[in-house]
Regions:
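Alpha-helical structural motif
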Residues: 3-6, 10, 19, 117-120, ...
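Acidic-enriched, low-complexity/disordered segments with a strong bias for Aspartate over Glutamate
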Residues: 5, 20, 27, 37, ...
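Basic, nucleic-acid-binding surfaces and adjacent catalytic neighborhoods in DNA/RNA-processing proteins
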Residues: 22-38, 44-47, 81-83, 141-266
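A cross-family signal for N-terminal binding/gating loops and helix N-caps
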Residues: 1-104, 108-112, 239, 252-256, ...
Length: 266
């Protein structure tokens, strides 16, 4: 599941493959930009902003994409077989002499002027992995609506950018609060520590191929000890042994330990 750390990794891969290279092929398979032709333009670079990707292109253009739940960018050598999914799932193709970047299942793909990037990402709060990171502003934003459930406040990218559903559940566990606890009910020291922990976790995972919040490097698709609660329904809590519970919050699954975490539950 793409979150701020994995989106940053995607940006790095795209930047390494495309930056300072001339596009030999461009194909944007979305109706609004289907006729756009970027062939012959030089890619200036790719960067991430929260969970958004911005690929800047010669001529004052930016290709903005967002992966949401299922999207991905894959980079292939020129003669390499594409293995990211069936052809009908491809939304973008950017080729240079040496590499091809293929965007699969991209729910957001738009071409805009670079000077207008703010229309796509200007609403975001401080980026946990960006140069604009400001913990004080992030904390202020997070607590601005005291009655709002903590889980919802953490997912709101206007508060702080980069947290997705996995980090939401993990941060609530580490704060010993259920995702439904009103954010204003967090003790002041806990709220400060929560923001610092969010930064610490994303920084720790920014270059890791497998995300972990517990320190474990175990691999595998099935839930392991890499995460405290996410995806571990009915498994014993790694701290107290109580079975982890799961429920939906704002249409997304969330996870918590009924013994370690205090606050309202469904």
């Amino acid at each position: 599941m793409p979150e701020g750390d994995t989106v940053l990794q995607t940006a790095k891969r795209l930047h390494t493959a495309l930056a300072d290279q001339v596009l030999t092929r461009s194909d944007l398979r979305v109706p609004r930009f289907a006729t756009a032709d970027l062939t012959g333009r030089t890619v200036l670079g790719t960067l991430s902003r929260g969970k958004h990707l911005l690929t800047r292109i010669e001529g004052g253009l930016t290709l903005h994409s967002h992966l949401r739940m299922d999207g991905s960018w894959r980079v292939y050598a020129t003669a390499e077989r594409w293995r990211g999914g069936p052809a009908h799932q491809i939304r973008a193709i950017l080729s240079t002499a040496d590499h091809t970047a293929v965007g699969y299942r991209l729910p957001v793909l738009e071409l805009l002027r670079t000077v207008d990037e703010g229309k796509a990402v200007g609403h975001l709060g401080p980026d946990l992995l960006g140069p604009d990171w400001d913990p004080d502003t992030a904390l202020h934003n997070l607590l601005a609506a005291p009655a709002r459930p903590l889980g919802e406040a953490l997912l709101d990218q206007r508060n702080l950018a980069g947290i997705g559903n996995i980090y939401k559940a993990e941060l609530c566990f580490l704060a010993r609060a259920t995702p439904w606890l009103p954010v204003g009910d967090l003790p002041a020291t806990t709220a400060v520590r929560l923001v610092a922990t969010a930064k610490q976790l994303l920084e720790a995972n920014r270059d890791r191929p497998v995300r972990t919040t517990t320190g474990s490097r175990a691999r595998g698709y099935l839930p392991t000890e890499r995460l405290w609660v996410y995806g571990r329904t009915h498994r014993p809590c790694l701290r107290c042994g109580a079975p982890i519970r799961a429920a939906e919050q704002d249409t997304r699954p969330t996870y918590w330990c009924p013994r370690c975490q205090s606050g309202p539950t469904p």
